[in-house]
Amino acid sequence: MSKFIINPSNSMYGNLKIPGDKSISHRSIMLGSLANGVTKISGFLEGKDVLSTLKGFQNMGVKIERNSDNVIIYGVGLNGLKKSLVPLNFGNSGTSIRLISGILAAQTFDSELYGDESLSKRPMGRVINPLVQMGALIESNDGKLPIKIKGGQTLKGINYDLPVASAQVKSCILLAGLYAQGETCIKESILTRDHTERMLKGLGYRLDTNKNKICLTGGAQLNAANIQVPSDISSAAFFIVAASIAPQADITLIGVNVNPTRTGIIDILKLMGANLSLSNECVIGGELLANIRIQSAQLKGIRIPKDLVPLAIDEFPAIFIAASCAKGETILTNAKELRVKESDRIQVMADGLSILGIENEVFEDGIKIKGGVFSKPSSTIKSHHDHRISMSFAIASLRCHYAIEIEDVDNVQTSFPNFVELANQIGMNISLVSA
């Protein structure tokens, strides 16, 4: 196990290129494997979560070559996967296991899927239930991992109203729909990230989208293409918040994914008074990219709008740090989903903020944070093996006059392997220490 020791710093300057988007990297491996022909990927994220997806498809017979952040996939088509000789281990990656379940539900062979201790606590019923409605046969551990998927089932298209705002559930059903007889339609009451839909279209698959409804008909094919993965806004979020709260800061993040279904972090921080701007906007591979410049600002507390919650669901740990440095109170509700991430992010962040002297009140579906001044930490902060918790409390050092220690930070490797390197490059002072 490793820990962060972060010494105080109060300024950030420079330009950064953030690693590739995790969501898009996952999907590029999955859909590239199912496409006909050779898919070339650049900007691929080399984090542990995405490598779990890559390894899973290699175990199912797909030839994949990797050279740093460049990947070549020799697609096998929708029906070319082979039974893995070993159970498929997806480590800590909820995206991998939920999306791949939709693909495996339609295969001719049986599959067994499992993950690490953290992933084994997360709910799988939200994808199992619609897949069973489509005709899948799935055994689970009371709605959790491990799961066994029976091969040889004929799937049928369904009309499905998403009970929770989840791009993972939506994507799982769409991927199963590629194999299903007839039309599969999904209706979402609140907009969620749409990378799966964009990539399916980019690989030549027809989707019909009408406001909050997405439909596709099974039986068509995916055609290989070159995919450029933009920088991940969820990883960029730590530096966006860091520069916003630092006493002195002026940084620019290059080529960040600003897909409108992912920019809740930007919208929320602007409501709080952040000084940030976008430039050099362009569309590459169906995704919107831009440079983001962030300068120091005096933030104010807000009530976070309900419609922005799913558009910033992965960024809330960092937003909680921003709220801690804001003038007044910030209130978040309608975010119960945060309790079933890699950790209970509402409670774990609340506990850490209390260690730093920040008043907060926890709700079942959110939190109220009273902005203040970080005090001398009363103890070491526990990350609960959650990468976003570790990185969020690391950036708190920009407003803390004392060293902060964070336990169990190994999982930062799942999404942002060079976080410490980039943070120190622009003025932070983080040491990674083996415990």
Swiss-Prot record:
Annotated keywords: Amino-acid biosynthesis, Aromatic amino acid biosynthesis, Cytoplasm, Transferase
Active site, UniProt feature: 314
GO biological process, one term: chorismate biosynthetic process
SUPFAM superfamilies: EPT/RTPC-like
UniProt-listed Pfam families: EPSP_synthase
Enzyme Commission number(s) from the entry: 2.5.1.19
Annotated residues for binding of 3-phosphoshikimate: 22-23, 27, 166, 168, 314, 341
InterPro entries: Enolpyruvate_Tfrase_dom, Enolpyruvate_Tfrase_sf, EPSP_synthase, EPSP_synthase_CS, RNA3'P_cycl/enolpyr_Trfase_a/b
Subcellular location: Cytoplasm
Catalytic reaction list: 3-phosphoshikimate + phosphoenolpyruvate = 5-O-(1-carboxyvinyl)-3-phosphoshikimate + phosphate
Presence of the UniProt keyword Cytoplasm in the record: yes
Pathway note: Metabolic intermediate biosynthesis; chorismate biosynthesis; chorismate from D-erythrose 4-phosphate and phosphoenolpyruvate: step 6/7
Positions that bind phosphoenolpyruvate: 22, 94, 122, 168, 345, 388
GO cellular component: cytoplasm
Domain of life: Bacteria
GO function terms (MF aspect): 3-phosphoshikimate 1-carboxyvinyltransferase activity
Function: Catalyzes the transfer of the enolpyruvyl moiety of phosphoenolpyruvate (PEP) to the 5-hydroxyl of shikimate-3-phosphate (S3P) to produce enolpyruvyl shikimate-3-phosphate and inorganic phosphate.
Quaternary structure (record): Monomer.
Sequence similarity: Belongs to the EPSP synthase family.
Designated name of the protein: 3-phosphoshikimate 1-carboxyvinyltransferase
Name of the encoding gene: aroA
